[in-house]
Amino acid sequence: MITYFHFMALSVLSSFLVSTDANTKQTVTININVPQETLMDEQEVFSQNICKLIEYINSKGYKVTLGEAYRTHEQALIYAHEGLGIKNSLHCERLAMDLNIISPEGKLLCTIEEFRPFGEYWESLNEYNVWGGKWKHRPDSDHFQMSDETRK
């Protein structure tokens, strides 16, 4: 008889294979550690990528100030009700950030075309990075997020 037990311990999924020998009735336990993506792991990668994006933007002569990063679930519901966002925003998971980008001439960037080079760079950093300026329904040019697909 073989039984598997699983439990989460920080960022490692531990599997215990428990086998009972039919002849001796002795139980043998084998501990197997398998890497598992966690929200904290994703947040760390997201944060590192945001730093790379800001450095890239600065290297082109632009300045950056931070927009909204964290959003409570309550605030997400309010925004969704007002048509200004969605109720399951990745801001709530700390996997999305809005950036204000200022040109070398001091102009706040607003259009998708102005943000495009930075959005393309963002998406090149990680296969799960998504730039809001590419969305068909209600594009959001200053929005940068990391999809949570790795945990699904």
Task: Please give the residue ranges for each predicted region.
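N-terminal secretory targeting signals
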Residues: 1-32
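A generic structural signal for ordered secondary structure
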Residues: 3, 34, 56-62, 101-105, ...
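Solvent-exposed, well-ordered amphipathic alpha-helical segments
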Residues: 9-15, 45-56, 100-102, 144-149
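Acidic/histidine-rich, surface-exposed loop or edge segments in extracytoplasmic proteins
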Residues: 25-39, 101-103
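A generic short-segment signal for beta-strand/edge and adjacent turn/coil regions
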Residues: 32-36, 63-71, 113
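Second-shell loop/turn segments in exported
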Residues: 35-45, 105-112
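Secreted/periplasmic proteins that engage bacterial cell-wall peptidoglycan
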Residues: 44-87
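Catalytic cores and adjacent binding grooves of peptidoglycan-active enzymes
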Residues: 86-152
